[in-house]
From Swiss-Prot:
UniProt modified residues of type Phosphothreonine: T147
One MF annotation (Gene Ontology) recorded for this entry: protein kinase binding
GO CC annotation: cytosol; early endosome; mitochondrion; myelin sheath; nucleoplasm; plasma membrane; protein-containing complex
Protein name: Thioredoxin-dependent peroxide reductase, mitochondrial
Swiss-Prot/TrEMBL induction comment: Expression is increased after induction of MEL cells to differentiation by DMSO.
Active site, UniProt feature: C109
Modified residue annotations for N6-succinyllysine: K84, K92
Length: 257
């Protein structure tokens, strides 16, 4: 019975994926090259919004967990306009913000990447590197970087763009939409020992907050350094809590006068 149900499920998924593939193929025949990526994105977002089962992620096979070691990764990246082999080991002793985005030459993605790049120095000031990952090739990354921002490109980058053309990194981090072949907007904060401190995943149409990511990095570092915990909406200028029943009253008396 279970085997028959499994075959029926996979048959349904295959039919759905095949229908999407035919739709994409038909559109690319009829449309010019410049509009093909738009067509693909529209189809994927529409299906994702409808919650179709064909757009299941790989998270059922492997999901990174907070407090656990981050999955190892290795790939070719664009760093300061050059190609470089990069791995998780390169970030030992540093914090790492690893964030995934769907595709190069799209719409929300450049706003996120440019925003992180513009804040790169603030991340560096707290011993944190930022790496953006998509399933595009490193050649595509470089072409996008060489495209002016006013034309939807990235321009000069102060952060690294990593290629996941095999989709293995996205799969290992549990953010790959398997049948669509692209990653959701997953973001992982990894500490200097390679341990995941935070993870979040957005659906395709909504971008993330760079300021909130930086705030979280600073909060985790504060806890490690001072042994106190950070309340809601904490910033480096705001009070923290001593984690004990008696000592914590100092904080609560201060904020609830």
């Amino acid at each position: 019975m279970a085997a028959a149900a499994g075959r029926l499920l996979w048959s349904s998924v295959a039919r759905h994926a095949s229908a999407i593939s035919r739709s994409i193929s038909a559109s690319t025949v009829l449309r010019p090259v410049a509009s093909r990526r738009t067509c693909l994105t529209d189809i994927l977002w529409s299906a994702s919004a409808q919650g179709k089962s064909a757009f299941s992620t790989s998270s059922s096979f492997h999901t990174p967990a907070v407090t656990q070691h981050a999955p190892y990764f290795k790939g070719t990246a664009v760093v300061n306009g050059e190609f470089k082999e990069l791995s998780l080991d390169d970030f030992k002793g540093k914090y790492l913000v690893l964030f995934f985005y769907p595709l190069d030459f799209t719409f929300v993605c450049p706003t996120e990447i440019v925003a992180f790049s513009d804040k790169a120095n603030e991340f560096h000031d707290v011993n944190c590197e930022v790496v953006a990952v998509s399933v595009d090739s490193h050649f595509s990354h470089l072409a996008w970087i060489n495209t002016p921002r006013k034309n939807g490109g990235l321009g000069h980058m102060n952060i690294t763009l990593l290629s996941d053309i095999t989709k293995q990194i996205s799969r290992d981090y549990g953010v790959l939409l398997e049948s669509a072949g692209i990653a959701l907007r997953g973001l992982f904060i990894i500490d200097p020992n390679g341990v995941v401190k935070h993870l979040s995943v957005n659906d395709l149409p909504v971008g993330r907050s760079v300021e909130e990511t930086l705030r979280l990095v600073k909060a985790f570092q504060f806890v490690e350094t001072h042994g106190e915990v950070c309340p809601a909406n904490w910033t480096p200028e705001s009070p923290t809590i001593k984690p004990s029943p008696t000592a914590s009253k100092e904080y609560f008396e201060k904020v609830h006068q």
